[in-house]
């Protein structure tokens, strides 16, 4: 999936999604999507989506990364995942250094996700900007529609449309506070003048059976940000679930010039070490004229 953000949206107006069929093939199908609000003002967002039928593979080849060896000390630095800092919906230098001190009681949690940011200061301190990493652990708020075991075990499983919600949750998580990492790793966050996404690409490398979130446990730590839900809602906690499922996004930047910057990431299952998805984001990133990041 690749989407282009072409016009700012208005939060008080509804969005209209129009889907166009490009091709239906034996193995692939392709769709394009355009999103508008007030039609005469133009398209807010456009995307191309390709979907491939699942098939067995005689091998699995991926970037070799021992997550526990490379990042274990940072993941396990806290007893519980909720002991790591909660990432706000705007994790910018301005929010932490200008807005938050003036508004100490203001907290802007991210809707739909529990998002925890690991402290990577010791890992990044003596590394070049291009080798620095940001790690985010995420899990869904509320329970998700679960796929029956009989479907998962079938030779040719037929998934319901609800199964796509698990993939959509990963796409949503992949673009949270993305471009702020450029200024952070170049040590010029305070010099940011304007930041906006141009395009965002997500490529899944696995089937939906490896992207599943658990239902929400009934017993959560006291420091878990509360989730508001209607009485009797379908996403209510599941008493049979004792531990929630977390995924990890590994983020870095390796290019910035001319008012643009590149955000890259890999999404991992930290329990299995499987590389689930890759993301690439091109962004408009402008800094003060005298900004000077550290040399490589």
PLM region descriptions:
Residues 1-296:
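Terminal targeting signals and extreme-terminal segments of soluble enzymes
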């Amino acid at each position: 999936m690749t989407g282009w953000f072409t016009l700012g949206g208005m939060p008080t107006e509804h969005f209209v999604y129009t889907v166009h069929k490009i091709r239906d093939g034996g193995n692939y199908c392709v769709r394009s999507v355009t999103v508008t609000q007030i039609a005469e003002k133009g398209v807010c967002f456009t995307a191309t989506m390709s979907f491939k039928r699942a098939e067995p593979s005689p091998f699995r080849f991926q970037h070799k990364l021992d997550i526990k060896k490379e990042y274990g000390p940072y993941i396990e630095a806290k007893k519980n995942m909720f002991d790591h800092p909660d990432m706000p919906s705007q994790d910018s230098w301005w929010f932490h250094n200008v807005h938050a001190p003036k508004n100490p009681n203001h907290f802007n949690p991210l809707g739909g996700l529990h998002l925890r940011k690991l402290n990577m200061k010791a890992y990044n301190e003596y590394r070049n900007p291009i080798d620095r990493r940001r790690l985010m652990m995420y899990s869904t708020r509320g329970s998700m529609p679960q796929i029956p075991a009989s479907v998962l075990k079938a030779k040719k499983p037929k998934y319901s449309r609800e199964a796509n919600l698990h993939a959509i949750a990963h796409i949503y998580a992949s673009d949270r506070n993305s471009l702020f990492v450029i200024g952070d790793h170049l040590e010029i966050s305070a010099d940011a003048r304007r930041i906006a996404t141009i395009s965002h690409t997500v490529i899944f490398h696995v089937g939906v059976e490896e992207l599943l979130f658990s239902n929400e446990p009934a017993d959560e730590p006291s420091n878990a940000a509360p989730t508001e839900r209607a009485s009797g809602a379908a996403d209510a906690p599941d008493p049979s679930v004792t531990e929630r499922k977390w995924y990890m996004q590994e983020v870095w930047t390796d290019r910035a010039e001319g008012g643009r910057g590149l955000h890259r990431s890999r999404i991992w299952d930290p329990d299995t070490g499987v590389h689930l998805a890759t993301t690439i984001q091109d962004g408009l990133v402008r800094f003060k004229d005298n900004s000077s990041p550290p040399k490589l």
